[in-house]
Curated annotation (Swiss-Prot):
UniProtKB keywords: Carbohydrate metabolism, Cellulose degradation, Glycoprotein, Glycosidase, Hydrolase, Polysaccharide degradation, Secreted, Signal
Keyword Manganese attached: no
Region forming the signal peptide: 1-19
Pathway in which this enzyme or protein is active: Glycan metabolism; cellulose degradation
Region (Disordered): 719-753
Molecular function per GO: beta-glucosidase activity
Protein name: Beta-glucosidase A
Principal cellular location given in the protein's record: secreted
Naturally occurring in which organism (per UniProt): Aspergillus kawachii (strain NBRC 4308) (White koji mold)
Length: 860
């Protein structure tokens, strides 16, 4: 019997499993067509108006990248010059403009999560959007909430926010709003259940010596999908995200970019997504089935990098002409792309790209990879940084988590001799950008590695910033940055008034192997002898302060409770202003108010939720079974009664706060009604015509390997170049896939983000918070809910806010709980419902420090 998405999955195959034993993703067709619901109406109508004037080839040109390394951006679509529609520039990354110059390198998404600050998330998004816009990029390939962070050693966790879906969802949405308010389309990625680097792409894994033929499959049940991994994407869609990027992995043994259940049903029918779905680069595996399953844009356009062949382009034109892909589906692709373009106002701000992703030379061939086209200026060296360094410094400081403080901080500036110890204090000897895509761990760590990076315009190291502080006060500072020079470290620490020890742990994307870490971390220990560096300093200095730059939690149990370790700070991946933002906290200019966005366990085993790092299904797709369900991070620790070292939401301050006066009030709200009715029939725009209308234009000078939408012959088989052309469509067209008739509206659907009634506010919760210390500071009240039920987490985060209070100041913090906040996913009804189990609310400063609690009244 095959497992479906609606059933719990618990496979432990060690050899090739039969198809009937593998997790199974049920089909869902046809692909829903956009209709302009929510606040998309105006953009949708403009898109319909322009697409109605396009030929089939022009529509196809919007959907297909022109090929890897050919034009200036990492992804580029064709345009419709006749109608004034330019080709669109798509560019990484979630923390700044990748492969460019004179751009900012922002703190990671994980650092934004550590701020717990919605406004900073928005401001960072807007600042990034401004830089993308100024560089001529139309679509930012970010932000990310996939990976969510199921496993603490997942390689790309730092690109996202937090393993908590509510914290991730709010900051994901605010980032998207900021990017799009700057006139750039934001891309919510990687959709969905993309939680490890191992086996994400079969060719990549084969390059590492793994004998597999298909990408790994994330296997999870329907409740886990909705309550955990889909949750932040619902927030993104409700926030108006223009694009969603489907992921490399399979979900229940169906590829992410042709999975009709996750794309057609969950994203488009249930969440009401009105924008377009693009493939991750080379995650497009089939032409017709991808189109019918809900893919709208193929990136970077070619089947294999620089191959000159494409599943779409000419082949998508052929597929419409021969009837295997209905006209309405391609019309819908084009409308979705143009609606996103218009929704953010890109047409008013459009400027051509003024940089090349492939060279820093000022001049080069227009079509880089094939050295064809005019030899022209490709890099204009436009400085787009504005005053964003100030925001970056602020986020860096506001995301620095104070984990321990035995009165050592803040520093006074009167310390006579400051020792700066550890490689992480200093510079990469090759330069801040000396390793391609930051694929090394040399010097201080300010971002992970992979496509989710950006070039630093500069990098202020801790050594530089702290030395400036010490010298300003006319005291002494000495540095030891060789992590294996233990004797010298011990000697320096002996002489110091305070030893600041810098350690790190890195990770990134799977195409880069750093010290045997294939993207994912091999373990949670500190890198480059970090534990021994700390112990050497602490054994010789009774005022040792540890600063951790890492991509997630690390194991600190060897030294965290050493009395000579007087303070511990986690700085995450703070970006270009790393040293300055840290100095602001160390010297008390900024009172730390950050909270850990993940749990710090005593051992790797405490987390469970293991990565699959060896094939477990013969040479078939490795099976990644999410048997823990919704119990990841603090939820799993709570379930297993596992005591962490530092819990989720934990963080100290230079002041103290008191919580009191919890009040709960029921609000008036409409009753919940499942969505019902039917959609309109699929619209079509314009006439298709016949093959003779789509031959290559006379006089066109074709560029080698460039992906075009036209035909080289009216013989469709000859034009397709597909060896299996002519196969009976009944062999591969799923039932209902080409049906453009009216379709039922799902109960959980009805608007962007799902049923609008889910967002009704049902309960108001208020507490009084007082600063009981002597200095001003920020506090983050956190509201958790117990949903009741025998198989539910003990508590789940639902609301939070970062607030600033002066000494002795108190404030009343109020927030609301929506129907969605109190609901569970009902697998049988395929809808959200508030169960009859008793519910409670908890408020406090971390997931394990919740002094206020109350029973919640019954609501529906």
């Amino acid at each position: 019997m095959r497992f479906t998405l609606i059933e719990a999955v618990a496979l432990t195959a060690v050899s090739l499993a039969s198809a009937d034993e593998l997790a199974y993703s049920p089909p869902y067709y046809p692909s829903p067509w956009a209709n302009g619901q929510g606040d998309w109406a105006q953009a949708y109508q403009r898109a319909v108006d322009i697409v109605s004037q396009m030929t089939l080839a022009e529509k196809v040109n919007l959907t297909t990248g022109t090929g890897w390394e050919l034009e200036l951006c990492v992804g580029q679509t064709g345009g419709v010059p006749r109608l004034g529609v330019p080709g669109m520039c798509l560019q990484d990354s979630p923390l700044g403009v990748r492969d460019s110059d004179y751009n900012s390198a922002f703190p990671s998404g994980m650092n934004v999560a550590a701020t717990w600050d919605k406004n900073l998330a928005y401001l960072r998004g807007k600042a990034m959007g401004q830089e993308f816009s100024d560089k001529g990029a139309d679509i930012q390939l970010g932000p990310a909430a996939g990976p969510l962070g199921r496993s603490p050693d997942g390689g790309r966790n730092w690109e996202g926010f937090s393993p908590d879906p509510a914290l991730s969802g709010v900051l994901f949405a605010e980032t998207i709003k900021g990017i799009q308010d700057a006139g750039v389309v934001a891309t919510a990625k990687h959709y969905i259940a993309y939680e490890q680097e191992h086996f994400r792409q079969a060719p990549e894994a084969q390059g590492y010596g793994f004998n597999i033929s298909e990408s790994g499959s994330a296997n999870l049940d329907d409740k886990t999908m909705h309550e955990l991994y889909l949750w932040p994407f619902a927030d993104a869609i409700r926030a108006g995200a223009g694009a969603v990027m489907c992921s490399y992995n399979q979900i229940n043994n169906s590829y992410g970019c042709q999975n009709s259940y996750t794309l057609n049903k969950l994203l488009k029918a249930e969440l009401g997504f009105q924008g377009f779905v693009m493939s991750d680069w080379a995650a497009h595996h089939a032409g017709v089935s991808g189109a019918l399953a809900g893919l709208d844009m193929s990136m970077p356009g070619d089947v294999d990098y620089d191959s000159g062949t494409s599943y779409w382009g000419t082949n998508l034109t052929v597929s419409v002409l021969n009837g295997t892909v209905p006209q309405w589906r391609v019309d819908d692709m084009a409308v979705r792309i143009m609606a996103a373009y218009y929704k953010v106002g890109r047409d008013r701000l459009w400027t051509p790209p003024n940089f090349s992703s492939w060279t820093r030379d000022e001049y080069g061939y227009k079509y880089y990879y094939v050295s064809e086209g005019p030899y022209e200026k490709v890099n204009h060296y436009v400085n787009v940084q504005r005053n964003h360094s100030e925001l970056i410094r602020r986020i860096g400081a506001d995301s620095t988590v104070l984990l321990k403080n035995d009165g050592a901080l803040p520093l006074t500036g009167k310390e006579r001799l400051v020792a700066l110890i550890g490689e992480d204090a200093g510079s990469n000897p090759y330069g801040a950008n000396g390793c391609s895509d930051r694929g090394c761990d040399n010097g201080t760590l300010a971002m992970g590695w992979g496509s989710g990076t950006a070039n630093f315009p500069y990098l202020v190291t801790p050594e530089q910033a702290i030395s400036n502080e010490v010298l300003k006060n006319k005291n002494g500072v000495f540095t030891a940055t060789d992590n294996w020079a233990i004797d010298q470290i011990e000697a320096l620490a002996k002489t110091a008034s305070v030893s600041l020890v810098f350690v790190n742990a890195d990770s990134g994307e799977g195409y880069i192997n750093v010290d045997g870490n294939l993207g994912d971390r091999r373990n949670l220990t500190l890198w480059r002898n970090g534990d021994n560096v700390i112990k050497a300093a602490a054994s010789n200095c009774n005022n040792t302060i540890v600063i951790i730059h890492s991509v997630g939690p690390v194991l600190v149990n060897e030294w965290y409770d050493n009395p000579n370790v007087t303070a511990i700070l986690w700085g995450g991946l703070p970006g270009q202003e790393s040293g300055n933002s840290l100095a602001d906290v160390l010297y008390g200019r900024v009172n730390p108010g950050a909270k850990s966005p993940f749990t710090w366990g005593k051992t790797r085993e405490a987390y469970q939720d293991y990565l699959v790092t060896e094939p477990n299904n013969g040479n078939g797709a490795p099976q990644e079974d999410f048997v823990e369900g919704v119990f990841i991070d603090y939820r799993g620790f709570d379930k297993r009664n596992e005591t962490p070292i530092y819990e989720f939401g934990y963080g100290l301050s230079y002041t103290t706060f008191n919580y009191s006066n919890l009040e709960v009030q029921v609000l008036s709200a409409p009753a919940y009604e499942p969505a019902s009715g039917e959609t309109e029939a699929a619209p079509t725009f314009g006439e298709v015509g016949n093959a003779s209308n789509y031959l290559y234009p006379d006089g066109l000078q074709k560029i080698t390997k460039f992906i075009y939408p036209w035909l080289n012959s009216t013989d469709l088989e000859a034009s397709s170049g597909d060896a299996s052309y002519g196969q009976d469509s009944s062999d591969y067209l799923p039932e209902g896939a080409t049906d453009g008739s009216a379709q039922p509206i799902l109960p959980a659907g009805g608007g962007p983000g799902g049923n609008p009634r889910l967002y009704d506010e049902l309960i108001r919760v208020s507490v009084t918070i007082k600063n009981t210390g002597k200095v001003a500071g920020d506090e983050v009240p956190q509201l958790y809910v117990s949903l009741g039920g025998p198989n539910e987490p003990k508590i789940v985060l639902r609301q939070f806010e970062r607030i600033t209070l002066q000494p002795s100041e108190e404030t009343k913090w109020s927030t609301t709980l929506t129907r969605r906040d109190l609901a569970n996913w009902n697998v049988e009804k395929q809808d959200w419902e508030i169960t009859s189990y008793p519910k409670m609310v908890f408020v406090g400063s971390s997931s394990r420090k919740l002094p206020l609690r109350a029973s919640l009244p019954t609501v529906h």
